[in-house]
Structure formats: structure tokens, C-alpha cells
């Protein structure tokens, strides 16, 4: 049974972009083929909820090799897109000390359906726990109204300067 939704999907106006790729780049360090978010469309810091999407394209680097003749978006890229969404949430509010929110781990990951080129993967993240050294989000991914994955994702502040 899928978990309870973090936000009523009918409340998400996917045409109302709050942050496009250029704006996301101001907060997230990923570039080129590792940029996995196209837009932020919902941002409610008081509720701890954010939503964005990735338009899955036919020309992406993984398409020729991840299930040739029937390309499927790799689950690891769904996880990466989720991590980037959570990183944006924290960076846009200056919640973490350090240069960016790094990927600390995932738990309770479940993939429920496939995501293919031509699909729009909508990801909703909800802040569950905040500590200065570790942040926990629950994320849910959708294609249309179908929940295609959900997971708990851990983030940790990363500084480009190494600690002595």
C-alpha cells in the first residue's frame, strides 16, 4: 500500500515554475548530465514541503544502455533527483552550514512503477527531521497520479574545505 501523500497533487500547478534550471543552479552544485531537476513548482518552508520535476528525455546519457529497446529511468537517478530537490530546499533557506547538502544515504526505498523517456517525474519532498549534522526527508515520486517511488533520504552538510 502506498504511503499517504505529502501534498494533494491537484494543488501542484506544474506550469507555475518557481525556479527553473538557472535558478536551481544558484543553490545546487550539480552540472551537465548530473543536473536531474528541471523546475521547482511548490515551496512551503513552514510545512517543510517542496515539489519539483524532471522531464525525462530521449537524449539522456543512460537511454541507450539502460534496458535497450525499452529504456527505463534508473532508480539511482530518481534517488539523485530527490537528493537534489532536498538540497535545494535546504540551500534556498540557508538551513545548513557548509557549501551544500550532500547525499548521506537512503532507507525504505520502494519503486512502484516504471519511468520512461517522455514522462514527467514529479517529486515531492517533506522535511521529517532537522539536525545540524543530518537532515531527513521523505520523498515521493509521481508520473501523472501514479506514485512510482518513495523513500527516506538523509542529507549531510558538505564543506569544500577539508576539516583538519
Each language-model region and where it sits:
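Hydrophobic beta-strand-centered segment that forms part of the acyl-chain substrate-binding groove
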Residues: 2, 9-18, 85-124, 148-150, ...
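Catalytic strand-loop segment that frames the active site of acyl-thioester-processing enzymes
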Residues: 32-73
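Hydrophobic core residues within well-ordered beta-strands of beta-rich domains
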Residues: 34-36, 121, 135
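Active-site helix/loop of acyl-thioester processing domains in fatty-acid/polyketide metabolism
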Residues: 40, 72-96
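Residue-level recognition of beta-strand microenvironments
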Residues: 43-45, 114, 128-130, 156
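Flexible glycine-rich active-site/ligand-binding loops centered on an Asp-His dyad
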Residues: 73, 141-163
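Acidic, glycine-enriched active-site microenvironments
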Residues: 118, 129-142, 146-149
Amino acid at each position: 500500500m502506498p504511503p499517504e501523500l505529502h501534498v494533494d497533487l491537484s494543488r501542484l500547478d506544474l506550469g507555475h515554475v518557481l525556479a527553473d534550471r538557472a535558478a536551481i543552479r544558484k543553490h545546487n552544485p550539480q552540472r551537465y548530465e548530473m543536473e536531474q531537476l528541471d523546475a521547482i513548482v511548490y515551496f512551503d518552508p513552514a510545512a517543510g514541503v517542496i515539489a519539483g520535476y524532471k522531464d525525462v528525455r530521449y537524449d539522456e546519457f543512460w537511454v541507450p544502455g539502460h534496458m535497450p529497446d525499452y529504456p527505463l529511468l534508473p532508480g539511482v537517478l530518481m534517488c539523485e533527483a530527490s537528493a537534489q530537490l532536498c538540497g535545494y530546499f535546504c540551500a534556498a533557506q540557508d538551513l545548513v552550514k557548509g557549501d551544500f547538502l550532500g547525499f548521506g544515504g537512503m532507507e525504505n526505498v520502494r519503486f512502484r512503477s516504471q519511468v520512461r523517456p517522455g514522462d514527467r517525474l514529479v517529486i515531492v519532498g517533506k522535511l521529517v527531521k532537522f539536525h545540524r549534522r543530518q537532515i531527513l526527508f521523505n520523498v515521493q515520486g509521481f508520473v501523472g497520479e501514479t506514485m512510482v517511488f518513495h523513500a527516506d533520504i538523509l542529507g549531510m552538510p558538505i564543506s569544500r574545505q577539508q576539516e583538519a
